[in-house]
Amino acid sequence: MSVSPVSIVSTPVAVSASPAGSPDQPAPPVTVRWRGVETYEASFDAMRAFTDARTADTGDEIWLVEHPPVYTLGQAGDPSHLLVADSGVPLVKVDRGGQITYHGPGQIVAYLLLDLRRRKLMVRTLVTKIEEAVIETLAAYNLASVRKAGAPGIYVASGVHEGAKIAALGLKIRNGCSYHGLSLNVKMDLRPFLAINPCGYAGLETVDMASLEVAADWNDVAHTLVRRLIANLDGASAAADKPQALEQHSND
């Protein structure tokens, strides 16, 4: 599968309702929260509750989570992309854009709860900023990665695994605010990806950083990723709560 470093032409974004809030109010610093190892359902419910309760004064947050094994299917997703019905991994239908993906131990999941109007961000611009943050994060570990036209996410740029997917992206926009986000594969059991057509693409190879011979620590990668996300959202001088609690994560 050949990959070219081009801008995406479609994005897995679900949009509902009309934007609300004040677009002229400056965006406060992003608060970063490490929520620990948490079931997908708990994170999903918390994201929706947070977004529903937002006011014009609610700060933006990035949540870093590691999930037990779970498949998630986007709101317009095709269930036939789950190839093994009795895999033992639960399937959760969700309201983000995109098709089916897998979350599990050894993967960083970052949820971006942002007021897009306040940040004066169009959805496509947000997607680009997220993708750039992942590309920059991987580059910090000497891994070259690219976007792929028509297939949102981040892909290996060259080598034996050229074209393999290493990060997935899916968002929901409600009342002008985003939730859901991205997942980056650090050191995982990749076998559950074989039971699906990842993001709806049959035969798409999925890799992690370990597959690319990078012995990266989950915490280090998470710190790098969140720094790049915040820098891309607010500029390199943006203030944010340092996610000290990430140090509690165990790679065992």
UniProtKB/Swiss-Prot annotation:
Keywords: Acyltransferase, Cytoplasm, Transferase. Residues 56-237 form the BPL/LPL catalytic domain. The record marks K165 as: Lowers pKa of active site Cys. It is found in: Cytoplasm. Substrate binds at R96, G97, G98, Q99, I100, T101, Y102, H103, A168, L169, G170, G181, L182, S183. InterPro entries: aa-tRNA-synth_II/BPL/LPL, BPL_LPL_catalytic, Octanoyltransferase, Octanoyltransferase_CS. It comes from the Bacteria. One of its GO terms (molecular function) is lipoyl(octanoyl) transferase activity. One of its GO terms (cellular component) is cytoplasm. Catalyzes the transfer of endogenously produced octanoic acid from octanoyl-acyl-carrier-protein onto the lipoyl domains of lipoate-dependent enzymes. Lipoyl-ACP can also act as a substrate although octanoyl-ACP is likely to be the physiological substrate. HAMAP family: LipB. This is Octanoyltransferase. It comes from Burkholderia lata (strain ATCC 17760 / DSM 23089 / LMG 22485 / NCIMB 9086 / R18194 / 383).
